[in-house]
Amino acid sequence: MSSTTVRPSVNALATPLVEALVADAAKLRLSVSAKSGEARLVDAGAQARGSIEAGRRIAEICLGGLGTVTIAPAGPVAAWPVTVTVHSADPVLACLGSQYAGWSLADEGGSSGFFALGSGPGRAAAAAEHLFEELHYRDHAAQIALVLESASAPPASVVAKVAEAAGVTPDAVTFIYAPTQSLAGATQVVARVLEVALHKAHSVGFDLAKVVDGIGAAPLSPPHPDFIQAMGRTNDAIIYGGRVQLFVEADDAEARGLAEALPSTTSRDHGAPFAEIFARFNGDFYAIDKHLFSPAEVVVTSLLSGTSHRAGRLVPELVERSFA
């Protein structure tokens, strides 16, 4: 990807999607708070009930307006046939430059104990992560949006931190938040199936400039009131039921190497529901082999040769065990 190429503003593209979400708050079962001079807060699943459709739209906001998310009754897991499909014609910017939950936000010095990972186009306006140096990208926009996997609204300290980092006033920021246990939360997490493949491609050192297009799909996980079980189900949807196809401007050797490196089957921890793996490591998320966080099955198509290279495998029985 050339640094001289004119890059779209992910926040500008996402702004109409955010405004449509807010306008439809009642029918999507969302709660919106917008006080003068303060950040706009959209509760999509904490105190508000939220909805699957809200989660689908939030996923498109997370992609910075550079991707489409659809939900359809089809898929490889017979007992759970509803599938979330994600497509982007600019998957690196959409997934890594916007959707990736890479910004750690905490109530530093406060007493709330608030912590959440920020995702969505607001990340690109702040560019607080080293990843943006590698992407040669920073967004500049009058309005920004950030999505939080959280059961509570961000405290004033986090709002101030985000606004300052992005170079905007607090009232120019929209926070959309929902816990993984909610309908919207589960949906938008499963919609990260393409993103985890891009993140894995980055982590194994593949030249991201060669990634041209991408599409991914995973079964929609049912929500669970327990956080660990809910997190486990969304992870299992991708790890054991996720499928991704990347289209790369690379030769067959590179495409084959990428395909072989991407699937979750490369992980030493592959083979059990995520909640069980999490318990095995006593709740230490970072002790789990990072190679596990990948789609189950990957196809990498070389646009230079027309040959597609496949690796990994679906494990529908583990999806069914997790979702039951």
UniProtKB/Swiss-Prot annotation:
Main location as per UniProt: cytoplasm
Compartment(s) where it occurs, according to its Swiss-Prot or TrEMBL record: Cytoplasm
Reactions the enzyme catalyzes: 5,10-methenyl-5,6,7,8-tetrahydromethanopterin + H2O = N(5)-formyl-5,6,7,8-tetrahydromethanopterin + H(+)
Keyword Cytoplasm attached: yes
GO BP terms, alphabetized: formaldehyde catabolic process; one-carbon metabolic process
Domain of life: Bacteria
Keyword terms: Cytoplasm, Hydrolase, One-carbon metabolism
Gene Ontology molecular function: any one: methenyltetrahydromethanopterin cyclohydrolase activity
Pathway where it operates: One-carbon metabolism; formaldehyde degradation; formate from formaldehyde (H(4)MPT route): step 3/5
Pfam families named among the record's database cross-references: MCH (PF02289)
Keyword Cytoplasm: yes
GO cellular component, one term: cytoplasm
EC number: 3.5.4.27
Annotated family: Belongs to the MCH family.
Known role: Catalyzes the hydrolysis of methenyl-H(4)MPT(+) to 5-formyl-H(4)MPT.
Record protein name field: Methenyltetrahydromethanopterin cyclohydrolase
Gene: mch
